[in-house]
Amino acid sequence: MNIRLAGTKDIEQLIKMRWDFTLEDYPDKKIQDSDYNQFHEECESFLLNAFNNNHWYIWVVEIEGKIVSNIYIEVIHKVPRPGRITYPFGYMTNVYTIPESRGLGLGSKLMTEINKWAEELNYEFIIVWPSEQSIDFYSRNGYIHCKEPMENTLS
């Protein structure tokens, strides 16, 4: 088992995992196989951009050359505030382990590495908007509920 940051060589596996994750999590969404090419193009562009800037970090668990789990972290740089040093925070999303690798503690091991990495880089905190099914997982890994954010849905 290898826990590491993803790179451009991982793009095809990451695209497939994102596709599978969406199909699994939203079975009623009526996504067609014919949608894959357009999705692939958009996701590939996103990943190439993510690997070429310092705003996204994609962590993976790899076993025998196959990525079996991933977590995406977007770095959010805050506006400086007088009287204190301003540190960034992380937004965690796209947390996914393939079905046949679940229940092995891989997600928790990945989360442990990410938390150590974020502490070393002086991140102030990491936020995640969990689904109902994932709340226990995040709780086991040190996350607590905070006040609900507000949103303005624009589209």
Model-found features: residue ranges?
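Conserved GNAT-fold acetyl-CoA-binding loop/helix
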Residues: 22-46
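Conserved GNAT acetyl-CoA-binding A-motif
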Residues: 111, 118-130
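A short beta-loop-alpha structural element at the N-terminal edge
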Residues: 2-16, 27
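Conserved acetyl-CoA pyrophosphate-binding loop and the N-cap/start of the following alpha-helix
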Residues: 101, 105-113
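Conserved beta-strand in the GNAT
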Residues: 60, 66-75, 91, 96
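A short helix-loop-beta-strand connector motif used in the catalytic cores of GNAT acetyltransferases and
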Residues: 44-59
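Conserved beta-strand-loop-alpha-helix junction that forms the acyl-donor binding cleft
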Residues: 126-136, 151-154
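Conserved acetyl-CoA-binding loop of GNAT-fold acetyltransferases
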Residues: 5, 123, 139-149
